[in-house]
Design a protein with these regions (language model features):
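The substrate-binding groove and active-site-proximal loops of carbohydrate-active enzymes
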Residues: 1-9
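Beta-strand-rich binding/interaction modules
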Residues: 90, 98-120
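Aromatic- and carboxylate-lined catalytic core of secreted/periplasmic carbohydrate-active enzymes
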Residues: 13-100, 128-133
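C-terminal beta-strand-rich structural cap/linker in extracellular carbohydrate-active enzymes
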Residues: 119-136
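Generic structural motif
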Residues: 69, 78-82, 107-113, 121-123
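Proteins with a high burden of low-complexity, intrinsically disordered sequence enriched in S/T/G/P/A and R
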Residues: 1, 37, 95-97, 112-115
Length: 136
């Protein structure tokens, strides 16, 4: 539906999810339809300089650019991808369906949302389809 509005946190999360799904699946480029200075009436997800979608691109940049990609695992319920940036390990994980349980690797004790809000974790974490970054 081209007249559906996809904005804010939903747009941010969809961009992060699409980007990490693409990396996981070996898709080296993901193109967005249009980037405009102001919202365009026919598109559902707007890429403008201050949109939620662009905030998603900034999160992907912070989490992945400059990292060494160490591959992904998919247990059928959760996909997790290991990265290392400047010697610091991280894992990005998300549920393949509505929810899934994931235990972060040893040493990764914080879970960071796509809003870059981090909380301490230990043991299994319930994930949704929105990627979460686990860091030391």
């Amino acid at each position: 539906n081209p007249r559906q509005t996809i904005q804010g946190a939903e747009a941010r999360d969809w961009v992060v999810q699409t980007s990490f799904d693409s990396l996981h699946l070996g898709i080296v480029r993901t193109y967005w339809y249009i980037w405009t200075p102001a919202p365009y009436p026919l598109l559902g997800m707007q890429l403008t300089n201050d949109s939620g979608a662009v905030k998603g691109l900034r999160i992907v940049e912070q989490w992945a650019v400059g990292s060494t990609w160490q591959g992904c695992t998919d247990d059928g319920s959760v996909t997790s991808c290991a990265l290392e940036k400047n010697g610091v390990p991280a894992t990005v994980a998300w549920a393949n369906a509505v929810t899934g349980s994931f235990t972060p690797p040893a040493g990764l004790s914080q879970a960071c949302s796509t809003a870059n809000e981090c909380v301490p974790v230990s043991g299994p974490v319930e994930l949704t389809e929105t990627p979460v970054r686990f860091i030391p």
